[in-house]
A protein has these predicted regions:
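Terminal, compositionally biased segments used for targeting/anchoring and flexible tails
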Residues: 1-112
Length: 112
């Protein structure tokens, strides 16, 4: 089980990896293809983010797999209830994965 200090450190490490990812050509290309389309973000950006997170959690004893990331997230969620800083860092990670997108123009015609 992660300690509070390890939880904070691991989330800071993930944030660093995500910031590096955002500067990469692959991420920027995917982002330019997405625009405000959340479905495209899930298809193109989310896999890049998950891969970066899986690689980051290996430094804290978890495997670079969906199972390892799931176990890590379970432990972080448990810590977030005990530690406000872990909760804040989790929120920051979440906002990097799914940033707020501007609402579509209300006057634009909706596709049928």
């Amino acid at each position: 089980m992660l300690t509070k200090a390890e939880g904070r450190a691991s989330l800071l490490h993930i944030l660093k990896k995500l910031r590096q990812l955002q500067k990469s050509a692959a991420y920027q290309e995917a982002e330019s293809q997405c625009g405000n389309d959340m479905l495209k973000r899930v298809q193109l950006i989310y896999p890049l983010v998950i891969r970066a997170e899986m690689n980051a959690v290996t430094d804290y004893g978890f495997t670079a797999s969906f199972a390892g990331l799931s176990k890590y997230m379970h432990e972080i969620y448990a810590l977030s209830g005990e530690d406000k800083e872990v909760e804040r860092l989790m929120s920051e990670v979440r906002s990097m994965i799914f940033p707020e997108l501007p609402l579509p123009d209300a006057t634009a015609a909706l596709p049928l």
